[in-house]
């Protein structure tokens, strides 16, 4: 199974970068994990609502252009479904059984465009709380790792 994470913005904090590297290393035995990091579209100073929508639309176009062909798209969105870690592991089990590869999408600071959200197969919320987008990447990788441990009946802290 292949798992792509498409995200807008670079990680600037060393502690987040080291966490991401650690989980990428831990995930190697379970499948090919790759991260596609895209540059943020500049938000104009004193941006209007229509300016912000244009930024989200442009980022959405960039994201969709970088999703690997045929991958099952899951957008991280505050209004998406909330899953337990066990339920999240079912997403991977189902994908594996159906021969699908997964692509998780993390937007920029303004979020994801309505057009992109309409184009994905699933919307997932990691929490009702707000996280920075780099932190979201780290939390997602940890949950992906946890999901594989659950699927394989391997121990992991609860």
Swiss-Prot record:
InterPro entries hit by this protein: Alpha/beta_knot_MTases (IPR029028), RlmH-like (IPR003742), tRNA_m1G_MTases_N (IPR029026)
One Gene Ontology cellular component annotation held by this UniProt entry: cytoplasm
Superkingdom, taxonomy of origin: Archaea
Main location as per UniProt: cytoplasm
Pfam families (UniProt xref): SPOUT_MTase
Alphabetically ordered keywords of this record: Cytoplasm, Methyltransferase, rRNA processing, S-adenosyl-L-methionine, Transferase
Signal peptide span: none
EC number: 2.1.1.177
Residues given in the record as S-adenosyl-L-methionine binding sites: 76, 107, 126-131
GO molecular function: rRNA (pseudouridine-N3-)-methyltransferase activity
Subcellular location: Cytoplasm
Record field: catalytic activity: pseudouridine(1915) in 23S rRNA + S-adenosyl-L-methionine = N(3)-methylpseudouridine(1915) in 23S rRNA + S-adenosyl-L-homocysteine + H(+)
Function comment: Specifically methylates the pseudouridine at position 1915 (m3Psi1915) in 23S rRNA.
PANTHER family: METHYLTRANSFERASE, RIBOSOMAL RNA LARGE SUBUNIT METHYLTRANSFERASE H
Similarity comment text for this entry: Belongs to the RNA methyltransferase RlmH family.
NCBIfam families in the cross-refs: PRK00103.1-3
Protein name in the entry: Putative ribosomal RNA large subunit methyltransferase H
Organism: Methanocorpusculum labreanum (strain ATCC 43576 / DSM 4855 / Z)
Species classification: Archaea, Methanobacteriati, Methanobacteriota, Stenosarchaea group, Methanomicrobia
